[in-house]
Amino acid sequence: MMRSEPRALQLNEHGQLKHFLTLDGLDKTILTEILDRADSFLSMGEQSVKKVPLLRGKTVVNLFFENSTRTRTTFELAAKRLSADVINLNIETSATSKGESLLDTLKNLEAMQSDMFIVRHSDSGAAHFIAEHCTPNVAIINAGDGRHAHPTQAMLDMLTIRRHKGSFDGLKIAIVGDILHSRVARSQLQALTTLGVSDVRLVGPKTLVPSFFEEMGATICHDLEAGLKDVDVVVMLRLQKERMKGALLPSESEFYRLYGLTEETLAWAKPDAIVMHPGPINRGVEISSEVADGKHSVILNQVTNGIAVRMAVMSMAMSGQLQSDETPAAKDEK
């Protein structure tokens, strides 16, 4: 069976989202629609009743095969604020721990008339595989798959940047740390280039910043000062030791000495630069507490914006499913 192209698999025949698997193939119009819709949801956090009925009567299943705090919780909050019923599958106590295959687990959940799966998995391409094998009327949202993609994280980062900088025009952005193992960096780079940012710098040691990222439109910097010089946005990434094989860096202390973001190294960026981090933060490894908690940090804003972005993506995907000619109901009407 041939693997579907990302754009063809993610959009219905009207060009609307029906799955959200990767930013690869999605154009500026769709990304901007996600940001605009998320902006409209942000004000809900200030209301006494933080709900809208857009997913009322729908069942959302969180399938997290990797540990998560922020992503799983914000997806659950987003679904509940859209009035959906939410099921959090405990993978450790589910039948998958007894040897049941991923596909069999999904087919059983489909039989329970689930409407949307939020999937995090250690294997790259897992969300794509699920979208290809699920019934057409179930929406699949990728909450992170291996090194491949983390599209909702990238979009909440884009919303954070836009809200603090106004637009993406002329911005200089540095992404610092373990680029090699980061699905976040890959999705961020796709989003930034699609939204028109031409100066994106990937900063870190040669072992963690492969040269092939230049083909995606980034500038590679192995010197922190050169990477941070006059940038508007600094995105710090943690060292993903759980994915590392072999000696990719001498030590955490050496990494911090060469690439850690401190008040001194942040001074190389613009005076009004913002500092971002997708979490979890390792203080004293990639970032100092003074910077993480300082006036330039928008890290907690990212978490807040994540709820709104995930509400936007989930509501758009469900709407795209309902308007798709591929749904069983639509086929019955023909």
UniProtKB/Swiss-Prot annotation:
Any idea which UniProt keywords this protein has?
Answer: Pyrimidine biosynthesis, Transferase
Gene Ontology biological process terms, A to Z: 'de novo' pyrimidine nucleobase biosynthetic process; 'de novo' UMP biosynthetic process; amino acid metabolic process
State a GO cellular component annotated for this protein. cytosol
Q: Which reaction does it catalyse?
A: carbamoyl phosphate + L-aspartate = N-carbamoyl-L-aspartate + phosphate + H(+)
Recorded hits in Pfam families, A to Z, give: OTCace, OTCace_N
State the source organism's domain of life. Answer: Bacteria
Q: Which residues bind carbamoyl phosphate?
A: 70-71, 120, 150, 153, 279-280
Q: One MF term in GO for this entry?
A: amino acid binding
* Enzyme Commission code(s) on record: 2.1.3.2
Return the broad EC class.
transferase
Q: Which InterPro entries match?
A: Asp/Orn_carbamoyltranf_P-bd (IPR006132), Asp/Orn_carbamoylTrfase (IPR006130), Asp/Orn_carbamoylTrfase_sf (IPR036901), Asp_carbamoyltransf (IPR002082), Asp_carbamoyltransf_Asp/Orn-bd (IPR006131)
Chain sites annotated for binding L-aspartate: 98, 183, 238
Identify the metabolic or biological route this protein is part of. Answer: Pyrimidine metabolism; UMP biosynthesis via de novo pathway; (S)-dihydroorotate from bicarbonate: step 2/3
Could you confirm whether the keyword Transferase appears in this record? yes
Against PANTHER family, the record matches this protein to: ASPARTATE CARBAMOYLTRANSFERASE, ORNITHINE CARBAMOYLTRANSFERASE, MITOCHONDRIAL
The UniProt entry, under NCBIfam families, shows:
asp_carb_tr (TIGR00670), PRK00856.1 (NF002032)
Record HAMAP family: Asp_carb_tr
How does the record describe its quaternary structure?
Answer: Heterododecamer (2C3:3R2) of six catalytic PyrB chains organized as two trimers (C3), and six regulatory PyrI chains organized as three dimers (R2).
| Task performed by this protein | Catalyzes the condensation of carbamoyl phosphate and aspartate to form carbamoyl aspartate and inorganic phosphate, the committed step in the de novo pyrimidine nucleotide biosynthesis pathway.
Q: Which family does it belong to?
A: Belongs to the aspartate/ornithine carbamoyltransferase superfamily. ATCase family.
Q: What is the protein named?
A: Aspartate carbamoyltransferase catalytic subunit
Q: Which gene encodes it?
A: pyrB
